[in-house]
From Swiss-Prot:
Function: Usually encoded in the trnK tRNA gene intron. Probably assists in splicing its own and other chloroplast group II introns.
One GO term describing the cellular component: chloroplast
Entry's Gene Ontology molecular function annotations: RNA binding
Keyword RNA-binding attached: yes
Organism: Cuscuta reflexa (Southern Asian dodder)
One of the GO BP terms on file: mRNA processing
Protein name: Maturase K
Xref: Pfam families: Intron_maturas2 (PF01348), MatK_N (PF01824)
Keywords: mRNA processing, Plastid, RNA-binding, tRNA processing
Main location (coarse class): plastid
Disulfide bonds: none
Amino acid sequence: MSLVQIQLKTEDFKIYLQLPVRSQQHNFIYPLLFQEYIYVLVHDRDLKRSIFFANIGYEKKFRFQIVKRLINRMYKQIHLTTYYSNYSNKRTIYGLLKSFYYKLLSSGFSFLFEIPFFFKFISERKKILKSQNLRSIHSIFTFFEDNLSHLKYVLDLLIPNPPHPEILVQKIRYWVQDASSLHLLRFFLHEFCSVKSLITTNKSKRNERFLFLLYNSYICEYESIFLVLRNQSLHLGSMSFVTLFERNIFYGKIECFAELFAQDSQANLRLFKDTDPSMHYARYRGKSILASNGGLLLMPKWKYYIVNFWQCYFYLWFHTERINISQIDSHPFYLMDYISSIAQIPSMVRSKMLENLFLINNDMKIFETFVPIIPIIGSLAKAKFCNLLGNPISKPVWADFSDSDIIERFGRICRNIFHYYSGSSKKRSLYQIKYILRLSCARTLARKHKSTLRGFLQSLGLKLLEEFFTSEEQIIFLTFPNASLNLRGVSKGRIWYFDIVYINEQANF
């Protein structure tokens, strides 16, 4: 099949997906699994790196004969479930799980579930461009700086594990009307997928695209019902969910939610009417926060509502310990690898009016963010850069690389950590991490050359120091070559970047 034919097939597929729901109700996704070009698109390098998440590593070996053989099996109705007729043959089952047929079929199936939302994203890209910076993780902290300092309480929520596969299929059927595709999804969930693995943050050899799709459909269902107080609908497509794939969720202010929901449940939400409805919600991965400036009765009511929601709608036993209610000004909260809190000592802002006619002193609360140094040192110790006390050690695994490669690896990790935690209010912890990585790099090089650490540092000198410069330090060093090497005073202020779309697990150790 030529590239021109594949492109024409893709255009036909796009037109097919844009048909009204009634026209594609019986032939929505399942018939497309019998088309060869779908598997070509899955394997194609350009589409592997989707805009939704990074490359997940498909099989490098691709043969049209395998695809045609799989399609012929499906045409002849040789179902995968027939392999399970003999459960005593465990080798056959294991071979089926690891077979290339299953990988092709699951990859094509998840690809077909993803593309409709991709076209929806393209059709609304003009709206996205106006708020493109909101895709960055750091954008949510700028939102916190403007709004959380004026609020009183925060509800810290750990989202439960996904429910039973059958319940998950029942929830997905609200936005997928193809019965055949749902049966195939049920087969994948019951026979191949571990539901607990849907929320794991570790890299796995499983089909990550398929797992991310299922997990985000579960989150979408939860948040659409969770925002029923605002929209009076049980199956809401949230404004933030232009696509249903993992990225930081950015919500605006929820205003007047009591009036929107009062018509349906006046008795249950009677106490909400007398409170200030200013409320903010944010989520990343399996953790979310709900902040409000309401009274003492508002947040416990929300906690009671959330617990009953998980138990009644998803049939999950939700432990109340997973929800914590605290005051923002006295208890910090942990979100997106940052420790956030409100400064105990407010900042004084003095306003001058009409040339010394009078002065106005305003106390302003400052939103602060800190680096979680203990978890980062734990990650460094797990990656064999230091011990649990933070003392640098050599990394023998990298001793076989060249000197420039070793220095570049350590320097890249250091720069990535500095880049992500550039919004920290205090940079002292970051320089401690830089010290650990720099000394670990020197110990690794000294181990490679069978030299002492002191002698190696004296011979290497400035070359080792320059590789660990951050982007801000590099600009100053190039502009002022005679500047002091002690650059700890550089970039004391917080810097938020709008090019960070995911947490890279402490620079991919």
